[in-house]
Amino acid sequence: IAFHDVAPPFPPQEDWRGWLRGLFERYRQSLQKHPNIAPLLGAQLVSNSGINPLLVEQILAALKAAGFEAPRIVDAYNAVVAAMIGYVTLELAPMPDDDPVDWAAELEDRVRALPAEDYPLLVEHLDLLSNKAFIVRWQSGRVNPLTGGFELYVDMVIAGLEGILSRRKDGAAA
């Protein structure tokens, strides 16, 4: 099983932020070892048939420790699972089956030929973006991982959860 060690027990004294960050990192590492299952996880409801109750329990424990309560803990749980699966599924998307070498070369040529007058910011940042950013890449994260974006994404998810909790503490609806 690819995910047997993704969700270790959440000790009550542990910081929920660090535990969630570790969850995202372990999940990504597991999928990097088994990238062929990535497209199945987010795209087919049948992936739920391999339910991992320990994963659900530990995510809920971390969210409860953060301060989420019913019914909002369900929304937070869904957001965490979607975040955990989403980025990595996109990052590890497989190459097309039909002539992947020509497909990659054609896409690279199309990206590099974009006119600056139509796409000034894209062309200005093309050397930074080319094959290192979603939409303008021609290699999968299997070969060319998007680690910096993943780390920023995890930071954003955790900061978003913190923001929701702090709004609730300030009296706004969370």
Task: Locate the predicted segments by residue.
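Short, basic, alpha-helical segments at the C-terminal edge of helix-turn-helix-like DNA-binding modules
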Residues: I1-D5
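Generic detector of contiguous secondary-structure segments
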Residues: R17-R26, E69-V74, W103-D118
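Hydrophobic alpha-helical connector segments
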Residues: A7-I37, L41-L54, A70, Y77
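Hydrophobic alpha-helical bundle segments that form small-molecule/ligand-binding pockets
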Residues: L55-Y77, V88-E108, E162-L165
